[in-house]
Amino acid sequence: MTSPTDRVPSVPEPAGQQAGAPDDLDRLRRRTVVVLAAAQVLGGLAAGSVVTVGSLLAVRLSGTEAWAGSVTTASTLGAALAALGLARLAVARGRRRALSTGLALAAAGAVAVVAAAVLPSFPLLLVGGVLMGVGGAVNLQSRFAATDLSTSATRSRDLSLVVWTSTVGAVVGPNLVHLDASAMRLTGLPELASVFVFAALGLLAALVVVQVGLRPDPLDVAGRRDGTTGERRHVPLRVALATLRRHPRSAGAVLGMLAAHAVMVAVMSMTPVHMQGHGAGVNLVGLTVSLHLAAMFAFSPLVGLVADAAGPLRVLVAGMVLVVLAAAVCGVAGGDHVLVTVGLGLLGLGWSAATVAGSAIVAGDVPGPERVAIQGLSDAAMSLAGAGGGAMAGVVLALVGYAGLNAVSAAVAVLAAVVVLVVSRRAERVLPAT
């Protein structure tokens, strides 16, 4: 039975019959963005913990540094596997059910990591990493959920505000390790395990925020507004791919996001190795990575405003140009740590522009259930692109060095930018610009 808080507010059918309805929808849009942003802050603690603390725990439980990246890899795999499933669940049952399910699985993953540290069990740690990766898929879907009730005038801004709140998790999550000693004394848990207790609590708090705050469900309201409420159905992967082929602007946007994400992960993951090889200390490496993360997320609202004003396609291409410029700066930096830091900052800003603008194009280009399916496909592909970029980066670094890695990365970004421009211009001959 549907509870009163779940009922979807009716959207005016003939224009002008319900003068207050547009204002009601706008208030609901703003509230939805705030709820998603709050959940992103709480759930983001887990993502920040996986990258830093997960690698330390992996070394401790496996007994070798060779498995240091295993938890991050497992988390990335979990995000990729979950993205399509959560998108299908959103189409069938709404955003609230999809996001809540993902957060519950991620919280279970954090508990599994704690159990792995207590037992100890390295295989259980990897299982926990996969489940925590579902939280990454929730973060990705949340940015699209923020656009369910948006218009073309606010779509990029709404999306970017949710992306921006990821900054909190990226910064605070790794630093929870400083509370570990105190938590060990209070709980008796093994070293590093308490960080994932905090992560589990954050994920559960995010689940409560989503359950309480996303009422009515924004996807239900959007379906009522757009006249697609009765079209909820499972969209197979082949149908999503066929839909993407019929919408070249979205296809180009997805390609741009994949290229920017793969290059970002490849260059970022190998930069600490390069810097330490040129004498940089751990503190300097940490500062450089922190500035890069700040550039990725902190400027997202500004990027969203520019995309709404100038058009997301222009901002997407500008982001690709910044990625190329960043690779060029890093490639010629050598042992100049200042240049490397500048390059990583440009890389983060380029990633932000490409991701925010590309996501806005995907969110506004395809109607009905196919839109959510393509969003899930995009999220899964981004996770796989990041995993592929990180995996190949080490091989390329060993073969041609840091400068060569950046040259290859720049070439990938240039090729992707050209394809984005070509397919988008072809689309504009048939369809109006996004």
Where are these regions (language model features)?
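Cytoplasmic helix-loop-helix junction between adjacent transmembrane helices
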Residues: 128-165
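C-terminal transmembrane helical hairpin of 12-TM major facilitator-type secondary transporters
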Residues: 299, 310-358
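Juxtamembrane intracellular "pre-TM" segments in multi-pass secondary transporters
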Residues: 9-30, 215-255
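Helix-to-loop junctions at the C-terminal end of transmembrane segments
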Residues: 82-95, 181, 298-312, 397
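Intracellular juxtamembrane helix-capping segments at the cytosolic ends
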Residues: 54, 137-151, 353-367
